[in-house]
């Protein structure tokens, strides 16, 4: 069957972005440089920012100078990066080693960006002196790379102590070499060594310098000379993240009439099995007693019915952005119908499922774009339950699981299952609850959802 004129897919008529996240009209590789004393959350910010940029389509990589330093240590000097004296400004030999580690990281970063492999590089190190930052700026100018600084400033002892206790004492510098108490004492001495030479970012350093200061884990910010799309996205993201204890629950709606018939999209109501799941979901959260839980629901009938038995004080909001991927002219069809009527469309979708756009409909790439405000709100909020659809939840899970975009359309999300995500400093815990409709019992596993066996769904 021929596609009606004007409905051919899949490329937009505006400038298309390549696999590195750049428009075909302009390509400016970006270097994001972290600044700050140890235990200020620089690596946490680097990893979260890298995940976000990759999810939005920018090929991004973190270059952590500490890892280069540790790789430079030989077997006879395994502790050479751990002892606080190594970070003393008076330790000339150590300064040479640290400078060489930074140089190697910068060279690898430039190779990554200039080879066309990457679009954004994050240079994760303390970079606490003006001299060190000037070296980076001059290097980036020579390589024609756009440079943006992120300084994490913190004078809250509780935040610093939490970061040192929860993260640093278990870092590769200390693990297996010292007790937790020894590691903490040594790391606090390391911080004191850095303080002796710390020069905070300031516009007087260079009026043209582009930077953002993140103060006390996001309580306030200072932004200066932001340039370009990437830097604007970075600022937008940093102003929305936090690391307070919380959980994010994700579930598809219960089985709908279209699900039972194998049809795409539509707005059909729940089947009897779907209604059972809706009741069981309400019972689950009645028992869990999640404090301050908010419910975000798609505007489709099947999603609203799934959330209808939840307690009124959960405060349910209905988001158009959470609606299922629009299958366009294929809405209401089965996959067999599509193969028979639109074989070329079926083949195009199988070839590149992430970028494929249904005629008069959407692609997964489009869904990611409309979900960005949802992700930002999820980063800002406390406990949230999201009731939505398979394609939408694949996009959300790919973000929190840090899955590549090529895997995103294949994350297997069964009906009548609930995913609990608990964000941590450097990863996200995932627990899956599956409901047995006959017994009404939930089974629990701690794991990420796998990829689908079938490339069709």
From Swiss-Prot:
Keywords: ATP-binding, Hydrolase, Kinase, Multifunctional enzyme, Nucleotide-binding, Transferase
SMART domains, per database record: PGAM (SM00855)
Positions of region (6-phosphofructo-2-kinase): 1-244
PROSITE patterns: PG_MUTASE (PS00175)
Residue numbers binding ATP: 36-44, 163-168, 346-349, 390-394, 426
SUPFAM superfamilies registered for this protein in UniProt: P-loop containing nucleoside triphosphate hydrolases, Phosphoglycerate mutase-like
Membrane-crossing residue ranges in chain numbering: none
Pfam families the record matches: 6PF2K, His_Phos_1
Transition state stabilizer (site feature) positions: 252, 259, 389
Biased composition (Basic and acidic residues): 9-20
Positions annotated to bind beta-D-fructose 6-phosphate: 69, 98, 126, 132, 168, 190, 194
One example of a Gene Ontology biological process annotation: fructose metabolic process
Superkingdom per UniProt: Eukaryota
E.C. designation(s): 2.7.1.105, 3.1.3.46
Catalytic site positions: 124, 154, 253, 324
Reactions listed under catalytic activity: beta-D-fructose 2,6-bisphosphate + H2O = beta-D-fructose 6-phosphate + phosphate; beta-D-fructose 6-phosphate + ATP = beta-D-fructose 2,6-bisphosphate + ADP + H(+)
A Gene Ontology molecular function term of the record: ATP binding
Described function: Synthesis and degradation of fructose 2,6-bisphosphate.
Name this polypeptide is given: 6-phosphofructo-2-kinase/fructose-2,6-bisphosphatase
Organism phylogeny: Eukaryota, Metazoa, Ecdysozoa, Nematoda, Chromadorea
Gene transcribed to yield this protein: pfkb-1.2
């Amino acid at each position: 069957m021929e596609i009606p004129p004007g409905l051919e897919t899949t490329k937009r008529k505006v400038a298309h972005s390549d696999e590195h996240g750049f428009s075909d009209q302009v390509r400016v590789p970006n270097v994001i440089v972290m600044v700050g004393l140890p235990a200020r959350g620089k690596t946490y910010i680097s990893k979260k920012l890298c995940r976000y940029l990759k999810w939005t389509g920018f090929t991004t990589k973190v270059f952590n100078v500490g890892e280069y330093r540790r790789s430079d240590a030989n077997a006879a000097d395994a502790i050479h990066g751990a002892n606080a004296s190594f970070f003393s400004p008076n330790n000339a030999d150590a300064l040479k080693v640290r400078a060489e580690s930074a140089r190697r990281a910068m060279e690898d970063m430039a190779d990554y960006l200039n080879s066309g492999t990457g679009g954004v590089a994050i240079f994760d190190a303390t970079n606490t002196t003006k001299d060190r930052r000037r070296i980076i700026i001059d290097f980036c100018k020579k390589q024609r790379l756009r440079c943006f600084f992120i300084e994490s400033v913190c004078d809250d002892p509780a935040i610093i102590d939490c970061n040192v206790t929860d993260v640093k004492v278990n870092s590769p510098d200390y693990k297996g070499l010292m007790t937790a108490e020894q590691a903490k004492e040594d790391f606090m001495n390391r911080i004191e060594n850095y303080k002796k030479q710390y020069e905070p970012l300031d516009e007087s350093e260079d009026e043209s310098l582009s930077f953002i200061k993140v103060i006390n884990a996001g309580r306030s910010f200072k932004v200066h000379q932001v340039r370009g799309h990437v830097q604007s996205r970075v600022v937008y993201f940093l102003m929305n993240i936090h690391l307070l204890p919380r959980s994010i629950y994700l579930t598809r709606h219960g089985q709908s009439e279209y699900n039972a018939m194998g049809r795409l999209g539509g707005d059909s109501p729940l089947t009897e099995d779907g209604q059972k799941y809706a009741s069981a979901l309400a019972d689950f959260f009645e028992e869990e007693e999640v404090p301050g839980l908010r419910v975000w629901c798609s505007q489709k009938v099947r999603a609203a019915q799934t959330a209808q038995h939840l307690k009124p004080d959960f405060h349910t909001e209905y988001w158009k952005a959470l609606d299922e991927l629009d299958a366009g002219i294929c809405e209401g069809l089965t996959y067999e119908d599509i193969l028979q009527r639109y074989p070329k469309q079926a083949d195009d979708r199988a070839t590149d499922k992430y970028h494929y756009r249904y005629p008069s409909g959407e692609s997964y790439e489009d869904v990611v774009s409309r979900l960005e405000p949802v992700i930002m709100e999820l980063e800002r909020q406390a406990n949230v339950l999201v009731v939505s659809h398979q394609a939408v939840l694949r996009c959300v899970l790919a973000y929190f699981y840090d899955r590549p975009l090529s895997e995103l359309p294949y994350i297997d999300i069964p009906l009548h299952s609930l995913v609990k995500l608990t964000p941590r400093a450097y990863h996200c815990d995932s627990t899956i609850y599956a409901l047995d409709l006959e017994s009404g019992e939930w089974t629990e596993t701690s794991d990420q959802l796998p990829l689908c066996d079938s490339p069709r769904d």
